[in-house]
């Protein structure tokens, strides 16, 4: 009888201590954000600052995003999405030449990337190279997407690029 009671107490103590241990601390199962993910968050925030007419705050976010994207691109090279955002942030910071280089690197990986083709087309319009913008539009022609219509309107002068 005493043995059964002692065993019951020991089992209870063991179960209670394990339940407390299971609830304490971080199990490591939560996924931490990558530099790419953090950069995308900064870009979204920067776009919101632009909508609120806060260009200095937007620029700071684009700068932070660009630094994170450069790090991400070094660690995981040849990702079209990373190169798209690198082109975008670089262009937003006024460096059209290097922005174009990032876009072209991305197109070398995925020539039909919708975002890169649209943004590169917008860059070409902004730098008065309409013939090259039309080439990007032709790539988007069959996509049945908003990006095609936006770029078409920008090339036609019916819409001003928001980027």
PLM-predicted stretches and their roles:
Residues 79, 113, 145-148:
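Residue-level recognition of tetratricopeptide repeat
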Residues 24-33, 134-163:
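Terminal, low-structured helical/coil segments at or just beyond the last alpha-helical repeat
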Residues 75, 109, 140-143:
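Structural marker of alpha-solenoid helical repeat scaffolds
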């Amino acid at each position: 009888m005493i043995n059964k009671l002692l065993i019951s107490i020991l089992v209870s103590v063991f179960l209670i201590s394990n339940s407390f241990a299971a609830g304490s601390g971080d199990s490591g199962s939560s996924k931490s954000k990558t530099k790419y993910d953090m950069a995308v968050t900064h870009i979204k925030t920067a776009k919101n600052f632009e909508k609120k007419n806060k260009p200095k705050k937007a620029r700071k976010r684009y700068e932070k995003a660009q630094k994170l994207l450069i790090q991400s691109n070094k660690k995981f090279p040849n990702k079209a999405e990373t190169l798209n955002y690198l082109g975008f942030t670089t262009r937003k910071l006024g460096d059209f030449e290097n922005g174009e280089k990032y876009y072209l690197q991305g197109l070398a990986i995925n020539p039909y990337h919708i975002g890169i083709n649209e943004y590169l087309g917008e860059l070409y319009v902004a730098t008065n190279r309409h013939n090259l913008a039309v080439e990007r539009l032709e790539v988007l022609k069959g996509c049945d997407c908003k990006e095609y219509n936006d770029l078409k309107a920008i090339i036609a002068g019916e819409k001003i690029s928001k980027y």
